[in-house]
Regions:
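Amphipathic, Lys/Arg-enriched alpha-helical "gate/interface" segment within cytosolic domains
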Residues: 2-135
């Protein structure tokens, strides 16, 4: 996978949760870099939910092999913290196609849900509105 200098994602940690905001033209390497950063963060162990906001993504370039590589990476973090619920907010066809490819992996690390809005995502999780983490 190609490497990029700029990172088209933002991480907003909340009490027991995380909102990931992707934007622009996203590559599989960006998604992997995001997951690497999250898994390396000491707050990862307390993470119970992740809302992935991909509404600002213009396009996602990811082959099936790259999605499988991301999934292979996620197996490690899932072993240390299997309690994470993930909900994606996405409408871009290339993002939805990649999520479909991920969901087709039978032994994937995490089960994901796709919603149309942040409100719906929080309702799916039973998560309260953003509460910045104190630390």
């Amino acid at each position: 996978m190609a490497e990029r200098v700029d990172v088209p994602f933002d991480l907003a940690w909340e009490a027991c949760g995380l909102v990931i905001r992707y934007s622009g033209n996203l590559m599989a390497s960006d998604v992997l870099a995001c997951h690497e950063r999250i898994a390396a963060d000491p707050r990862f162990d307390d993470l119970r939910f992740a809302i992935v906001d991909a509404r600002s993504v213009q396009a996602l370039t990811a082959t099936s092999a790259e999605i499988e590589l991301i999934e292979a990476f996620l197996q490690g973090p899932a072993m240390t913290n299997p309690a994470i619920s993930a909900v994606f907010v996405a409408t871009e066809p290339s993002v939805l196609a990649a999520l479909g490819t991920y969901n087709a992996i039978s032994d994937r690390a995490y089960r994901i849900t796709v919603c149309d809005s942040l409100t719906e995502a929080r309702a799916q999780l039973g998560a309260r509105p953003a509460q910045p983490r104190s630390s």
